[in-house]
Amino acid sequence: MKHKSRKIITKRLISLLIFITTINVSFAQGYISETIQHDGLIREYSIYVPASYDGTTNFPLLFNLHGGGGTNSVWQVSSDMRPIADTADFILVYPQARPDPSDGNSFNWIPKVPGTFDDVPFFSSLIDTIASNYQIDQNKIYACGYSLGGDMTFELGCKLNNRIAAIAPVARTMQANPNSFCSPSHPTGVLTILGTADSVSVYNGITYFGVEYYISAAATHIYWATHNNCDTTATVNIVSPSVERYSWSTASGCTYVEELKVIGGGHDWPGSFGNMTIDANIEIWQFVSRYDINGLIGCINTSIIEDNVQTDNYKVFPNPFHEELTIEVKSDISNDFKIHNVVGELITSGKLNSQFNTIDLSSLAPNVYILNIKNQSIRLVKTK
């Protein structure tokens, strides 16, 4: 009788251990809901840690941001990247946007009324929190996002550039006047996935009553291509009958900017909804994982900060400059000069007459600019 009871207890104990093990395995393979306190609010996020993580190796970190008015719990189902995280060994995070008081407390990354709040510091705090709990590779932190989440992805690439290595906005171009808010400090990988028939985030930009709110896809890519010292003419490859891949590369062949142009595509996340000839999840990871905080891994990078520029006919200094730029002319031939911002807008122009030409550029915002003299283009950097 005792032997029989012992057998029953043993079977129950084994069953209990199997049950506990099953729970632990399921927990390890599922999202973990977490919170942090920031700016007086309790902020939520879901984190997925692959089973291969054991705390002995630094894992890359990828943020995936939901669209405006959405939630992370729904978005992590719609764009589930866990299978990729399992095979590629990275930590995956789906943060929840905060209530926007200027939009009925709907969940927005970018407030409807400018200045209502700024979520960039939240992401910096979130990175710190995750890094305190997990071994993450601080040189390989990436962000992607859909729609308004794509908008926030650009914000992170611009304003948290010291921590974000590469970005992948989907169904969103950049906000207007990027020179006023975007100051990347290192070569940054940028992938966009855009539908040419998107009625929400219009491919050619959004302008209402003469006011530009979002620049076009073309201007978005030129901005980042210029920042990354890439040729502004892209190479084109056909991915499928409905998708074209545009790539912008440096003179040494290092690609920093790519667009997956979905012909006739709408406000979609390809592979989950909309176009099904590509998988946004796979494309995003394959792209961003090629970069770290120093740029394209294995590529000899040309830094955003260049030294004084000297050619056979001109010398331009100091570069970077603070207020004044001097152009030394080495010949008696006078030439016109033009200075554009990185989206091609003319900032100033004039004629080089004397040997030393001093140009007052103190009114310019700190950023990257392009000086054109005859057929030569020279990259300028304005510092604070």
Name each model-derived stretch.
Residues 14-24:
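Bacterial N-terminal signal peptides
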Residues 26-61, 74, 87, 115, ...:
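A domain-start/cap signature at the N-terminus of enzymes
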Residues 97, 168-175, 195-198:
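Active-site nucleophile loop of the alpha/beta-hydrolase fold
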Residues 1, 306-384:
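C-terminal outer-membrane/trafficking sorting elements
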Residues 2-15:
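Bacterial N-terminal signal peptides that target proteins for export
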Residues 63-67, 171, 194-195, 263:
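The conserved beta1-alpha1 loop
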Residues 32, 36-52, 56-142, 152-155, ...:
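Serine-hydrolase catalytic machinery in alpha/beta-hydrolase-like enzymes
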